[in-house]
Design a protein with these regions (language model features):
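Active-site/binding-pocket entry motifs
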Residues: 49, 64-65, 90-91, 103, ...
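Subtilisin-like serine protease catalytic core
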Residues: 30-60, 68-112, 126-131, 160, ...
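Substrate-binding/access-modulating region of protease and related hydrolase catalytic domains
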Residues: 36, 102-187, 205-208, 222-231
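Autoinhibitory propeptides
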Residues: 1-31
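Short pre-catalytic strand/loop immediately N-terminal to key active-site residues, enriched for Gly-Thr
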Residues: 65-74, 225-231
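Glycine-rich, acidic and aromatic/proline-enriched surface loops and short helix-turn segments
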Residues: 49, 87, 120-126, 193, ...
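Residue-level detector of anion-binding/catalytic polar loops
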Residues: 96, 164, 219
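Extracellular S/T/G-rich loop segment that most often corresponds to the catalytic His/Ser-adjacent loop
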Residues: 45, 56, 183-231
Length: 231
């Protein structure tokens, strides 16, 4: 739900994000002069709303679900993720965002749309100077094997090209072997949640230890899909 008092929400958001940053030692990175400036991130998700906190951050938007040309997010998850990444109080403030909508208003999507987006990124990552790929999408390992192999192949190829690929462990835990695709790739960085029992658990079916990193994943306040709103 949306908070009506924007100033209060900003303060609460700042406190929560500060605690999240502290828990993963992000401040050590900031002290060495690093931020999100001059770093471009590709985000595969539900899209993005042009929130004022993302002014100047959204470099490009492509809609593989509805074919629209202007930015939108009919679910909210993509905007929430983009806020965590690039908003003023985000983890990498000022990072450039290349947003690819591959999930619909229910947060569901076709593997074929993710494959098309990944192919586009592979063909254009050098030209667009994309350094990081945030893959919020998670497909069950038991899903279509041929499509799964295509996604993993593209993900691994992007990693070999120098793109740091970060994927969620998924929300099908806490049973073993519940990490989703492409988080099961042996090459990429898979992130799980240390405060959500549903977070995917390893190992993978190839006996790879996953996830590599745990971070806060529950009740994180970020940007909403209306200006001045936070969720």
């Amino acid at each position: 739900s949306y908070c009506e008092n924007e100033s209060y929400t900003k303060l609460k958001n700042k406190i929560i994000m500060k605690n999240a940053k502290y828990s993963i030692n992000a401040n050590l990175v900031y002290k060495n002069g690093y931020s999100g400036k001059n770093v471009n991130i590709a985000v595969l998700d539900t899209g993005v709303f042009k929130h004022k906190q993302l002014d100047g951050c959204i470099k490009h938007f492509m809609d593989f679900v509805g074919g629209k040309e202007t930015c939108y997010d009919d679910n909210g998850h993509g905007t929430h993720v983009c806020g965590i990444l690039s908003a003023d109080i985000g983890m990498a403030p000022g990072a450039g965002l290349y947003v690819f909508k591959v999930l619909d208003y229910l947060g569901m999507g076709q593997t074929s749309d993710s494959i098309r987006a990944l192919k586009y990124i592979k063909e254009n990552c050098v030209r667009l100077n994309i350094k990081i790929l945030n893959f919020s999408v998670g497909y069950l390992p038991c899903s279509d094997t041929a499509e799964r192999i295509k996604i993993l192949k593209l993900i691994d190829e992007l990693w070999d090209m120098g793109v740091v690929v970060v994927a969620a462990a998924g929300n099908y835990g806490p049973s073993p072997f519940s990490v989703t695709v492409p988080g099961i790739s042996r090459k990429i960085i898979t992130v799980g949640s240390f405060d959500d029992i549903r977070s995917g658990k390893g190992p993978t079916d190839c006996c790879i230890v996953k996830p590599e990193i745990l971070a806060p994943g529950h009740d994180i306040i970020s940007l909403g899909t209306r200006d001045g709103t936070y969720v």
